[in-house]
From Swiss-Prot:
Name of this protein: Uncharacterized protein HI_0594
Transmembrane segments: 14-34, 117-137, 158-178, 188-208, 209-229, 240-260, 303-323, 324-344, 359-379, 399-419, 423-443, 458-478, 484-504
Main location: membrane
Biological source species: Haemophilus influenzae (strain ATCC 51907 / DSM 11121 / KW20 / Rd)
An example Gene Ontology CC term for this record: plasma membrane
Bilayer topology term: Multi-pass membrane protein
Amino acid sequence: MDASKKKKTFNFPSAFTILFAILILAVGLTWVIPSGSYSKLTYNSTDNVFVVKAYGVDDKTYPATTDTLDNLNIKIKLSNFTEGVIKKPIAIPGTYQRVEQHHKGIEDITKSMVEGTIEAVDVMVFIFVLGGMIGVINRTGSFNAGLMALVKKTKGNEFFIVFCVSVLMVLGGTTCGIEEEAVAFYPILVPVFLALGYDAIVCVGAIFLAASMGTAFSTINPFSVVIASNAAGIQFTEGIGFRALGLVLGATCVIAYLYWYCKKIKADPSFSYTYDDREEFRQRYMKNFDPNTTIPFSARRKLILTLFCISFPIMIWGVMVGGWWFPQMAASFLAITIIIMFISGLSEKDIMESFTEGASELVGVSLIIGLARGVNLVLEQGMISDTILDYMSNVVSGMPGSVFILGQLVVFIFLGLIVPSSSGLAVLSMPIMAPLADSVGIPRDIVVSAYNWGQYAMLFLAPTGLVLVTLQMLQIPFDRWVKFVMPMIGCLLLIGSILLVVQVSLYSV
């Protein structure tokens, strides 16, 4: 063997390749798993009636009354429909039926990629606007000036910033389910963490990991535990004490883990899981940052950064109070960007160049979102999601209490891969899974907790969720992330399992 030849090394596939492989697998599953469907109930506010959609038959309408819900074995308050708390179709228990097979073919691979991108256009526009905003601010030198001021003030107490960001993300997750919105924080916080001597994974840990742990142990999050409790026919305050306890334990684990990791890479930078890519990260996020030079932190730059920071609480307020979604969030960021353009002191040419360059850097992230949506479309159009739900509900039905609830936890781990939307999985699964708790004699709120903890254990890794979008944005290989996050998944499942078994045991006493 020629010693001069370089030894070949395995390069882990990119996010695009991983999702493309999963898309092909999803198409293949439509040939293996039988197609099936539950009848779905929706509320028509215009006519004040319930509409039941079943495969192969005409839609049926029923009076929007409590009696109708009782007759359909749906234990949800009528007000949750009439007041708009539940807007998505609800699966009706006991209505699953096999239907003709909906095979997907080769042409559906590319078709779903296009359709998924079209469905995700609102998110993509938000990301493009965010990227353009970052590009303009970068051109003004405001980020680098602010970074230098921050590094000087936090010298010796760098982890305090990691701690503060993590706590805020945990609180955002448990109260309002901050997930996609957190994408906006990466462009500003990655340079901060790199300047403090950390790596990009610390930034993902402080934002995505902390927010996801907070969402996993949701207390009042309307997009997961509240809608799941409503779909299960109970108050969301039932079981909130154990979820709050889990939140404290989970947040402690995340912060302690980040402290350990930060301390290790401070002492030995080569310990970083992304050490091989450190120069690429610094070139991308800190290409004009030199700690040995001085950039004046002028009043104009302070004003620009202030406007940038203000945009985030405005976004959070809009989501929580104003019912905003991505079009409104994009519009608010664009409005602030235009203000920054006028006070930036840049020429019209520089403004347009910096905006388009900033947006273009996030094209890959946007395409990942569209591809992930394409995978979900294949599963929906192949009509195999309901079949998997029906099969899993039959598996855990009739088990003893503790075994049943741990089985539910495992079921929701797998369902989290198929249906990465927390609200979507809640309205699909809770009307089916929650009544099973009655048959084994345990409260339904324990099933809601199992749903939340199981689903989010999967969403730390699920390629169809937000994780690949995050990793693509920061150019972090998926295998490095898996190595970093696995201990936290173990903590989540351990805490969740213990709390579930304790709740069942206390109820059985």
